[in-house]
Amino acid sequence: MFPLIILISFSLTSLSATATSGAGGGVANLYTCLIDHNVHNFSIYPTKNDQSSSNYFNLLDFSLQNLRFAASYMPKPTVIILPNSKEELVSTILCCRQASYEIRVRCGGHSYEGTSYVSFDGSPFVIVDLMKLDEVSVDLDSETAWAQGGATIGQIYYAIAKVSDVHAFSAGSGPTVGSGGHISGGGFGLLSRKFGLAADNVVDALLIDADGRLLDRKAMGEDVFWAIRGGGGGNWGIIYAWKIRLLKVPKIVTTCMIYRPGSKQYVAQLLQKWQIVTPNLVDDFTLGVLLRPADLPADMKYGNSTPIEIFPQFNALYLGPKTEVLSISNEEFPELGVKNDECKEMTWIESALFFSELADINGNSSNDISRLKERYMDGKGFFKGKTDYVKKPVSMDGMLTFLVELEKNPKGYLVFDPYGGAMDKIDDQAIAFPHRKGNLFAIQYLAQWNEEDDYKSDVYMEWIRGFYNTMTPFVSSSPRGAYINYLDMDLGVNMDDDYLLRNASSRNSSSSVDAVERARAWGEMYFLHNYDRLVKAKTQIDPLNVFRHEQSIPPMLGSTQEHKYSSE
């Protein structure tokens, strides 16, 4: 159990005062400050090609998951710092402020737009990498756990499974994803229809703010505690630890992988029925879809005589035995024709491995659950993602439009995540994540390619943007919803002169109002009616905008009328 320390005070008085004054001084100043305050685990950008160069780039690349941001021309951090304790984390924040370095916080490095390891505003910046702060402490008596902000989702799952086979946590399927960022943005996963998001199951947190204070839920206040659950990472401070609620699951669950390749017409018919059925299934049953263009030998028919144009993969998790899965699916969705050999019974932790990138296309993973602790992910690639929410059933013509656009790009994917269940029952203002009742499913558009295809990156980027525009009539509007954990810079970015409030003298209410209104363009897509409350929370916890990125929430230093809109 982590102690609930409200304020760390250990000879940092002078450092804190210097930091808030914006003293500056460059990398030498930062180096001296870190060493003086017992922070030794860091790597400085190399000025020559030697061992330090190798160490720096190995560290930079280790958790850099989107290779779009690994190119040599991309901005690089001056220093990469790996704090080993909360004391070192506090010192790191204050030293970075003293030396006037922008802070980018990295947990697992899965930011869709690289915001945890790249800064495009021209300021010198550092990466504060939390990988050394990855302890998970489980307390079965209270059915809670403390997970440090650098722990991955896989590490949390593994720690729970080591002490219980009937407890779980509701989060995503990527085991190498960092909990600090994932939970900050909401954290949707296969248990969300049953238990809500990861952030819905946070009962306390330890946040280190820009002044080096370590704040628990009571100390930060309910407005900030509300904001850090679903309001997006990189905004409020650095999450030192989450206290999460453990969730009861049966000893045996059932997983299914169901492949139904065929013509666009055939797949569209399945999807039309799927969108009606899945939001209304029992909460214990989640049935998602992964879609990609068919890239198969002509003689591979998969028992289907129709031409293979689209390759859909239906992924199911049911909190119960296989017999019930088959009964429910064949009663509610007979068109899918789920077969006995397409489903397997296993423990919940085995299902986490089954649906992870550690398994092959058929879900085979050797059942070695210790692999969930691995931080490094093989097979990294280049990718761009976008998201949508669907509130009304998509017509047959609409589904065909989806598939026609998908077929244009062999590097493209679609992911349909079903809503309903607990996602309908939890109030849309319970936490900062707002996409609740009224959503049938969420869409993730993905273009993913390898290095040998990177010369065509502009083609892939143009494709996904065109796809997104084509889908406008079929998805939510006023505003068009988006998921903050799938950041999309196409929606807009903060302007340098608006959001870089580097010190007190640069503040003025007019520019802050402009910044807040500019950010509303994408802020309301991510947060709907919760945007203004997030601005208030940001102003309360980080008025100088120390923790920021290209789509962070700006603080309000003046006053303005709350914006009104209607969500359709």
Swiss-Prot record:
One of its GO terms (biological process) is response to jasmonic acid. Its EC number is 1.1.1.-. Mostly expressed in roots. Disruption phenotype: Strongly reduced nicotine biosynthesis but accumulation of dihydromethanicotine. Inhibition of jasmonate-elicited formation of anatabine and other pyridine alkaloids. The modification Pros-8alpha-FAD histidine is found at residue 110. Its cofactor is FAD. It comes from the Eukaryota. It is found in: Vacuole. Induction: By jasmonic acid (MeJA). Disulfide bonds join 33-95. One of its GO terms (molecular function) is oxidoreductase activity. One of its GO terms (cellular component) is plant-type vacuole. Pathway: Alkaloid biosynthesis; nicotine biosynthesis. Residues 73-249 form the FAD-binding PCMH-type domain. The keyword Kinase does not apply. Keywords: Alkaloid metabolism, Disulfide bond, FAD, Flavoprotein, Glycoprotein, Oxidoreductase, Signal, Vacuole. InterPro entries: BBE, FAD-bd_PCMH, FAD-bd_PCMH-like_sf, FAD-bd_PCMH_sub1, FAD-bd_PCMH_sub2, Oxid_FAD_bind_N. It is an enzyme of class 1 (oxidoreductase). The keyword Lipid biosynthesis does not apply. Involved in the biosynthesis of pyridine alkaloid natural products, leading mainly to the production of anabasine, anatabine, nicotine and nornicotine, effective deterrents against herbivores with antiparasitic and pesticide properties (neurotoxins); nornicotine serves as the precursor in the synthesis of the carcinogen compound N'-nitrosonornicotine (NNN). Catalyzes a late oxidation step subsequent to the pyridine ring condensation reaction in the biosynthesis of alkaloids. Belongs to the oxygen-dependent FAD-linked oxidoreductase family. This is Berberine bridge enzyme-like B. It comes from Nicotiana tabacum (Common tobacco). The gene is BBLB.
